[in-house]
């Protein structure tokens, strides 16, 4: 399944988030405290304490944006968005190659997301590297954009060599656990919606939407 790269937050919302997060200096802690056994050995960053007031308020803002975004809903078919946290990496910090846990305390991880909150020119290094079968995809997006990718992927964050990287990360438990099935449904839904926008409703299109809905019902969990 190819990742989805998508603008989620406008400039004003990003500025509000960044100011709120960076003002609360007392709530940041060693990121290894939230990592699994395998990942803790290669994790070197700071994370906002998940149950702090700042984390709760801003996590809810991000979740609401994700839940109301039509493209995110069509791509991810989210049943539960969970584990949302904020991390920052300064000079010398990063996150070595690892795979996310299959199950968090808050739910199953089918899809992972990273929402960038720092402009790419404000720091050097810090790219998200997602391992594919033959190579590695490097991602460093403008502030407000996010990438959603399968949680089954090996991935890493390059060491930051200048500036500071600020992101929001989290996981999605999808109604469809299979990446392949989710890709098929996403393509079918996108095609049907494009036909609807161009030609309007028709009996033939009703059959396509019926097939999509029944496939979702059959494949869903």
Curated annotation (Swiss-Prot):
It is an enzyme of class 1 (oxidoreductase). Keywords: Dioxygenase, Iron, Metal-binding, Oxidoreductase, Vitamin C. Its EC number is 1.14.11.-. GO terms for biological process: DNA damage response; intracellular iron ion homeostasis. The keyword NADP does not apply. The keyword Magnesium does not apply. Gene3D superfamilies: q2cbj1_9rhob like domain, Rabenosyn, Rab binding domain. Binds 1 Fe(2+) ion per subunit. Its cofactor is Fe(2+); L-ascorbate. Residues 80-174 form the Fe2OG dioxygenase domain. 2-oxoglutarate binds at residue 165. This is PKHD-type hydroxylase P9303_20491. It comes from Prochlorococcus marinus (strain MIT 9303).
């Amino acid at each position: 399944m190819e990742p989805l790269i998508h603008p989620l937050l406008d400039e004003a919302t990003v500025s509000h988030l960044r100011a709120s997060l960076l003002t609360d200096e007392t709530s940041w802690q060693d990121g290894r405290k939230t990592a699994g056994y395998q990942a803790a050995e290669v994790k070197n960053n700071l994370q906002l304490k998940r149950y702090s007031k700042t984390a709760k308020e801003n996590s809810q803002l991000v979740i609401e944006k994700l839940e109301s975004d039509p493209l995110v809903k069509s791509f991810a078919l989210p049943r539960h968005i969970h584990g949302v946290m904020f991390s920052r990496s300064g000079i010398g910090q990063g996150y070595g190659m690892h795979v996310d846990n299959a199950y968090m305390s808050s739910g199953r991880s089918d899809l992972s997301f990273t929402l960038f909150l720092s402009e790419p020119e404000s720091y050097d290094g810090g790219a998200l590297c997602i391992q594919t079968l033959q190579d590695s995809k490097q991602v460093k997006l403008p502030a407000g954009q996010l990438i959603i990718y399968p949680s089954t992927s090996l991935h890493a964050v390059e060491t930051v060599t200048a500036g500071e990287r600020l992101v929001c990360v989290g996981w999605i438990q999808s109604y469809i656990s299979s990446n392949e099935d989710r890709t098929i449904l996403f393509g079918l839904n996108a095609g049907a919606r494009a036909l609807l926008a161009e030609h309007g409703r028709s009996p033939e299109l009703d059959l396509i939407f019926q097939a999509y809905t029944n496939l979702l019902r059959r494949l869903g969990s």
